[in-house]
């Protein structure tokens, strides 16, 4: 079982969120020069989540067999931060002033055990579920006022940040009690 306090976990969450926001800021100029259509944005995010899920599965398997390389860990963290950065960019487009604070606040409220170890199938299932929730509200008929999508982007952001934290801590499986 982890010896991290909730205060340490929150500080780690904030630091990782800042790293993702740095990635978002680095890509901001390109996004302004080449805006994406909504369908392309969702397709790109789907590909990023897919890469993250595949990477997590591979890393968890390699960790269980004792052949996990630092490169693989770095790739999983990179994929997780890309997903979070993509979601933060979408949130910033909707709320340029408060996007980061709202993600941070919701992250603190919903950390629970999401940044710790869990079975790979659960971790991957959660990522796919949050992506599916986001995709479902991406049409005007489901969310005509655009009020649901920000919550879905924040949920996927938080999950991706928690995946990056778990990868950084080497928590590929459910922790032993």
Locate the predicted segments by residue.
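Flexible "arm" and connector segments at domain edges
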Residues: 1-177
């Amino acid at each position: 079982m982890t010896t991290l306090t909730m205060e340490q976990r929150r500080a780690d969450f904030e630091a990782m969120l800042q790293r993702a926001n740095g990635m978002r800021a680095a890509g901001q100029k390109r996004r302004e020069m080449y805006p994406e259509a909504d369908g392309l944005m969702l397709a790109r995010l789907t590909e990023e989540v897919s890469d993250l899920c595949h990477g997590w599965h591979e890393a968890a398997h390699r960790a269980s067999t004792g052949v996990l390389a630092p490169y693989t860990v770095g790739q999983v963290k990179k994929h997780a931060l890309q997903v979070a950065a993509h979601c933060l960019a979408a949130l910033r487009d909707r709320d340029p002033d408060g996007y980061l604070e709202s993600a941070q606040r919701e992250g603190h409220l919903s950390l629970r055990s999401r940044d710790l170890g869990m079975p790979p199938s659960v971790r991957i299932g959660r990522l796919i579920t949050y992506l599916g929730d986001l995709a479902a509200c991406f049409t005007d008929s489901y969310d005509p006022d655009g009020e649901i999508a920000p919550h879905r982007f924040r949920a996927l952001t938080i999950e991706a940040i928690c995946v990056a934290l778990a990868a950084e801590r080497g928590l590929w499986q459910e922790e032993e009690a």
